[in-house]
Amino acid sequence: MTKRKLGMFDAELVKPAIVDSFRKLSPSIQWRNPVMFVVYIGSILTTLLWIQSLYGEGEASSSFILGVMLWLWFTVLFANFAEALAEGRSKAQAASLRGLKKETWAKKVKAANIPENWDNRPASELVSATQLRKGDIFIAEANDVIAADGEVIAGVASVDESAITGESAPVIRESGGDFSSVTGGTRVLSDWIVVRVTVNPGETFIDRMISMVENAKRQKTPNEIALTILLVALTIVFLVVVATLLPFSMFSVAASGSGSPIQITVLIALLVCLIPTTIAGLLSAIGVAGMSRMMAANVIATSGRAVEAAGDVDVLLLDKTGTITLGNRQASNFVAASGVTEAELADIAQLASLADETPEGRSIVVLAKQKFNIREREINSIGAQFVPFTAQTRMSGVDMNGEQIRKGAASAIQKHIESLGGHFPQEVLKAVDDVSRRGSTPLVVSQGTRVMGVVELKDIVKGGIKERFNELRQMGIRTIMITGDNKLTAAAIAAEAGVDDFLAEATPEDKLALIRKHQSEGRLVAMTGDGTNDAPALAQADVAVAMNSGTQAAKEAGNMVDLDSNPTKLIEVVETGKQMLMTRGSLTTFSIANDVAKYFAIIPAAFVATYPQLEALNVMHLSSPSSAILSAVIFNALIIIFLIPLALKGVTYKPLGAAALLRRNMTIYGLGGLIAPFIGIKIIDLIISVI
């Protein structure tokens, strides 16, 4: 997606965020965050106490109450600012998407007039894209902007999707395959396609993207809800504790005959400093930023729930082709069966591949031409009928002169031959095993009931993929390779790539069964898919990343869409989810650890007049009780601002196991949360004493 990269504190983001910070002071917005709502109420109470002090009836000096009041309001505003800044980044992304929506016209045709070729195209009616409805059909030719999301039902065209994906390389969109989905706002570069509209106005992919990224009423994720409950429970505990301090203070003064009861302003300051305001103020920003980071990676998540689930994933199902291997298998050798010459095998293999537009099919045609000078033939001129590949048959080929010529997986061809009453030779099975053990893919070719031999397809594992899988393994994530190859080929590639397990000769039903098996054992499963046959498994998976180049059914079944249509992106999705959970956990640890230092600052200051012995707890040697309280309140507010970059950017991602992550978290953010307030409060106290 083409967009200018904004800095974290870019003026375009900061100015609206400041305005939104004040707009969010509305009680209807504040009560959604229970912890910060307590600070909000405390700010109102101290404001009333300050107004009272102006008339000479205050419990403390008006300047002290004013200082506490202002910094309590700043605490609320800083939390609002963190959330508004995160939302602002999403809104900026939505604005760039909205810029893609331009006035577009469509060449609408009647359903009965779908052309088989461009020369026979019917007359079309020029209508505005806003008039198109689900089920309508339009034609798009070179230089036309595709008017709406839809499925290609005829033709093939080169399409520029850079407006959506940011990738300048054009993509091919054609009918009848897994690359039939087109997106409104993209442009046809060459040839023509007939498109059936799959959405109504306002429901397009871009509309849904805009809605997802700028939706202010973001649904809380389960972990976020659980953490909120914990924070509310802590707040209630501290509220009860602070509420008991007033009668305790009054009793202590009466019993000791010295000092004065604790002031309401001090109690409010103590409560605000003790409750977990840091994480409460940043919690929403962390969630929004997580979705924003996904979008920066060109992945659109339907909800924060999907991003969070990615962080909890235990099992990754990865398609071999395009994810683990480069996906451009090339024919490299012909292994003829007994009684068949290599040239005869090449001839039949080429016939089976004439109408096969896959890279593998085209490479077979080219290899036959290079090795034996077998020229390509026009499939219609030789009276052949193409039989396309399906996930169920796992074969393709042609029917010609009453004979079935097929190529496909060994098990599929064996089943096909035996169904026709033929015999599958043992030497061919041995050739299949030999090819598989080399890590190549064997395609068996047959003519009628006769097995002609094996075509060897070489596959190349992506560089660095083994190291990525090792990182995932350290994090406790199990990787499973999904492939249609036979078990020997799958085992060879799985060993080379370093995956934990593999599923060979996989059908859509096998994928679905595997997902359900792992889920029944309490694991979360992530997978990618692009075809209609992937839709059931995508719908079942906890994290389902659909390819933007895939079918409409796949995109509707998934809870994320990868605009780059890169299956390897699933690993990045999981890492981003992990980073969001790590950030939330780290800042929660830091926030709770903060309370210890604030306790040493405020408790002695609040009761030292009554109990001078408490001066021993003033380990920071703060200059005065009022300065100590004010310093703690100021630090409590400023730490939110200082942690905003960490909340938005996320903590540094490390591929570690749960125990190692916990140790790292406690060392950096637990110990850091203990030490930082002692230093910060002391520095602020020194500044106040100078002023």
Curated annotation (Swiss-Prot):
Binding site for ATP: D356, E360, F389, T390, A391, Q392, T393, R394, M395, S396, K407
Source superkingdom: Bacteria
Transmembrane segments: 35-55, 64-84, 225-245, 266-286, 600-620, 628-648, 671-691
The EC number(s) this enzyme carries: 7.2.2.6
Active-site residues annotated for this sequence: D319 (4-aspartylphosphate intermediate)
Enzyme class: translocase
Binding site for Mg(2+): D530, D534
Topology in the lipid bilayer: Multi-pass membrane protein
Catalytic activity: K(+)(out) + ATP + H2O = K(+)(in) + ADP + phosphate + H(+)
One Gene Ontology cellular component: plasma membrane
GO molecular function: ATP binding; ATP hydrolysis activity; magnesium ion binding; P-type potassium transmembrane transporter activity
Location relative to the cell: Cell inner membrane
Keywords: ATP-binding, Cell inner membrane, Cell membrane, Ion transport, Magnesium, Membrane, Metal-binding, Nucleotide-binding, Phosphoprotein, Potassium, Potassium transport, Translocase, Transmembrane, Transmembrane helix, Transport
Family note: Belongs to the cation transport ATPase (P-type) (TC 3.A.3) family. Type IA subfamily.
Self-association and partners: The system is composed of three essential subunits: KdpA, KdpB and KdpC.
Function of the protein: Part of the high-affinity ATP-driven potassium transport (or Kdp) system, which catalyzes the hydrolysis of ATP coupled with the electrogenic transport of potassium into the cytoplasm. This subunit is responsible for energy coupling to the transport system and for the release of the potassium ions to the cytoplasm.
HAMAP family: KdpB
Protein name as it appears in the record: Potassium-transporting ATPase ATP-binding subunit
